[in-house]
Amino acid sequence: MLDFNSKFGRAIKKHLKNQYFVWLTTVDAKGAPQPRPVWFVWDGDSFLIFSQPNAYKVKHVKNNPKVSLHFNTTDNAGEKDVIVFNGQASIDNKALPAHKLPAYMRKYKTGILGLAATPKEFSEEYSTAIRIKPTEVRGWV
């Protein structure tokens, strides 16, 4: 689905690699959008996000798997790119816990320690994996 060879695709690839947060928007029971920043890893095909099991985003995904994600408009290098993904979210019961995923630990170990938690404690607290497969991407660079 993603062409990483175009100018837009290269910007997407850069953001997937370098951004610390992505904004996840779910839809609540009243049909209202509910955005929140989340930690993520991109596995080449989908976003993987970890959540506390009773978080609203988990309930929202179970009731309506249609979600969107977007990056902040300006990245750390000052680039002003707009990238918005639409996708299908699901609870991934087969995902390894966060502390057993090298890519997740490379990216967020310092942040986890900043929460006064060990990686294993983080994985126990944020034990629900949400996988999001993009169905559409739009924006401009």
Where are these regions (language model features)?
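Charged, gly/pro-rich active-site loop segments
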Residues: 1-7, 81-141
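Short, basic/aromatic recognition patches
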Residues: 1-22
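Alpha-helix boundary recognition
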Residues: 16-17, 62-63, 123
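Short beta-strand segments
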Residues: 19-53, 61, 68-72, 84
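A short, aromatic/hydrophobic, helix- or strand-capping loop or linear motif
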Residues: 27-28, 72-76, 111-120
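A solvent-exposed, acidic/Ser-Thr-rich amphipathic alpha-helical stretch
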Residues: 45, 78-79
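Short, surface-exposed beta-strand-loop junctions and turns on beta-sheet-rich folds
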Residues: 55-57, 76
